């Protein structure tokens, strides 16, 4: 790790230590004979949800640190900012939830606290934003895509610009249903089958392809674009892991073609769909 990223690495390491401490504490509350008791888990569901969220953010920060190591100052600065945001978010949550957790959590002191304060200053964030805006291309730095992934990105970017973005504002502001014509066009593009193996009528390549497609559709509209690709992915993965072969043969081709449109019903403790 270069010196330019040393403070970021130190702070994220401390975040990982704190989360492991909380995770062990919660595991002691929900575990029975080395298994999770769902009733006990339900009693600490908000805390478990937050631990999962902060773990995801911390893991993303660790991946970003690895990525930035191979690039320059612009990428370093973006990475430092994300690491600081991740640690500050975790610090706020632990500080106000220690009584609920029943645990004194290892905090961010000294150098780590100074790092967060420095990176989250308004002037620093503004300077990073201006640097992103000023770049003619790759505002967030190079992705490192292969030629195939670049082609996927271009294809979905074009579709998002031409088909999704023009209806995004109307759909969102007036709470309209996604037009049938857009769903049909998505089916023809293979949007619904991008997470389904070809033996079941899909066109799964790899998870990076799914991420690229989701990002480009979300750029056009999260509601009318990005969310449409994640719903069949959630359902397809559940069927692939837990379904019988008969269920896979019956449902997956219909999902991949768009014949059956998938929706989800979820609950998030203390969040939007609670």
Locate predicted features.
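Glycine-rich flavin
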Residues: 87, 100, 158, 165-274
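Long, hydrophobic, amphipathic alpha-helical segments used as structural scaffolds
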Residues: 23-26, 30, 34, 62, ...
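Extended amphipathic alpha-helical segments enriched in small hydrophobics
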Residues: 4-71
């Amino acid at each position: 790790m270069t010196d330019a990223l040393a403070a970021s690495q130190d702070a994220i390491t401390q975040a990982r230590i704190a989360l492991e401490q909380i995770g062990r504490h919660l595991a002691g509350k929900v575990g029975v004979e080395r298994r999770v008791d769902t009733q006990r888990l339900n009693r600490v569901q908000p805390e478990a949800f937050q631990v999962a969220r902060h773990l995801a953010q911390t893991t993303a920060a660790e991946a970003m640190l690895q990525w930035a190591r191979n690039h320059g100052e612009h990428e370093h600065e973006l990475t430092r900012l994300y690491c600081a945001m991740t640690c500050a978010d975790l610090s706020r949550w632990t500080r106000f939830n220690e009584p609920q957790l029943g645990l004194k959590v290892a905090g961010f002191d000294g150098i780590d606290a100074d790092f967060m304060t420095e990176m989250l200053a308004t002037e620093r964030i503004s300077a990073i934003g201006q640097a992103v805006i000023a770049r003619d291309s790759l505002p967030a730095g190079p992705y490192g895509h292969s030629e195939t992934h670049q082609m996927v990105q271009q294809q979905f970017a074009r579709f998002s610009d031409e088909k999704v973005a023009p209806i995004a504002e109307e759909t969102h502001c007036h709470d309209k249903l996604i037009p049938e014509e857009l769903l049909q066009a998505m089916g023809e593009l293979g949007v619904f089958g991008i997470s389904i193996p070809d033996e079941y009528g899909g066109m799964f390549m790899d998870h990076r392809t799914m991420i690229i497609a989701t990002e480009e559709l979300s750029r056009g509209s999260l509601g009318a674009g990005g969310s449409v690709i994640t719903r069949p992915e959630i359902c397809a993965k559940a069927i692939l892991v837990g379904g019988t072969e008969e269920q896979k043969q019956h449902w997956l081709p219909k999902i991949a073609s768009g014949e059956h449109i998938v929706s989800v019903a979820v609950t998030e403790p203390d969040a939007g769909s609670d």
